């Protein structure tokens, strides 16, 4: 077998592989010898079929199997012998001429094919001792815990039916039919809908017009959908809602005690506070981690400058760009609405894709050298987390992971990345800094606004890219699946 390099430009490689017809003939004869005692051909005793007849009957199919095996197995072996790793699966090209293909299958012509691929760039790791980051630390006050516990209590608040007029804070149960230009519209009808007046859940003006109604009342409400309402067919339009009030209920007093905890399935009020404190710590810890990771990645980005494989960058960019356009379509907005242009947005996302690929390669190299591994238990937990997000679809999702090798890799990659960050945190200079909740959130909001100015869809659309780039864990999934259709007037569902 001859392996001839025909192209070596930057990271691009093209290899011509030639397997002489004689070698192919020898391999075919070996296979024929293996099967001659096993095949049954009319007119011949087992094992006595002449080689020429055996070749005539089985030669082409055996040769086709050989060709498939070579194309399947040799690329990896060739790259390994060259000490190269391809960025993506090599492209394989062979003759499409039928006459030439027949000659190859008849072992009358050399079998040739070409491999086209990009190699992963060599990365010489640098010392990370010079990386300095600040870890923001927050002391969670009892007042903040109590405030959150109160919100939990209010969400579980009981309501008692009243006969008087509805006031802000009361919950009404109602049926309604929404109409635009006298015609009912999709998502504008609901029965038994519950709404706490003053909650701001429904579009502006809707709740205000229900203050003062009583059970049994029928009322037509007129409102105007916001100009930026996600449903294009409703944005900026005047609508009427024919409302029938089924019940008015006043909120019961909220008391944080063991009885409340018991209703929530928790043994005591003290335990409830512990759980809430833990949730707050987790939320702040996640935010602190994101910002810490961003600092590390920014400095690694400054340290490493090398050519990135176009195939990886293009794949990353295409994924980001597809999500950006999906988000714009869902919101009914354009790039101009976000104070940018498509051309500028493309440039920014291309830069983001290049940065993410480069950092991904660096983190991969660091992790490999440090012996970072993802355990089977960690994979199982991550897959279980995925299953919990899609109740009722567990079997399909498990089958997807079993049948798609890349699916498991997509689960493994972020776990590996976080473990590499954990490793780096043991190697770099980390300084703790106490901050207030307001300082932490204000800084985060400022960064979000800065990103939004560049290209507003970025933070949401490129959430997956940002997970490696800026450590943001925001999902790029659709919002609430059914709520927008169920309650078009309900802004919180959008």
Curated annotation (Swiss-Prot):
Residues 169-254 form the PPIase FKBP-type domain. SUPFAM superfamilies: FKBP-like, Triger factor/SurA peptide-binding domain-like, Trigger factor ribosome-binding domain. It catalyses: [protein]-peptidylproline (omega=180) = [protein]-peptidylproline (omega=0). Residues 441-494 are annotated as: Disordered. It comes from the Bacteria. InterPro entries: PPIase_dom_sf, PPIase_FKBP_dom, Trig_fac, Trigger_fac_C, Trigger_fac_C_sf, Trigger_fac_ribosome-bd_bac, Trigger_fac_ribosome-bd_sf, Trigger_fact/SurA_dom_sf. Keywords: Cell cycle, Cell division, Chaperone, Cytoplasm, Isomerase, Rotamase. GO terms for molecular function: peptidyl-prolyl cis-trans isomerase activity; protein folding chaperone; ribosome binding. It is an enzyme of class 5 (isomerase). Its EC number is 5.2.1.8. Signal peptide: none annotated. GO terms for biological process: 'de novo' cotranslational protein folding; cell division; chaperone-mediated protein folding; protein transport; protein unfolding. The keyword RNA-binding does not apply. It is found in: Cytoplasm. GO terms for cellular component: cytoplasm. PROSITE patterns: FKBP_PPIASE (PS50059). Consists of 3 domains; the N-terminus binds the ribosome, the middle domain has PPIase activity, while the C-terminus has intrinsic chaperone activity on its own. Involved in protein export. Acts as a chaperone by maintaining the newly synthesized protein in an open conformation. Functions as a peptidyl-prolyl cis-trans isomerase. Belongs to the FKBP-type PPIase family. Tig subfamily. This is Trigger factor. It comes from Rhizobium johnstonii (strain DSM 114642 / LMG 32736 / 3841) (Rhizobium leguminosarum bv. viciae).
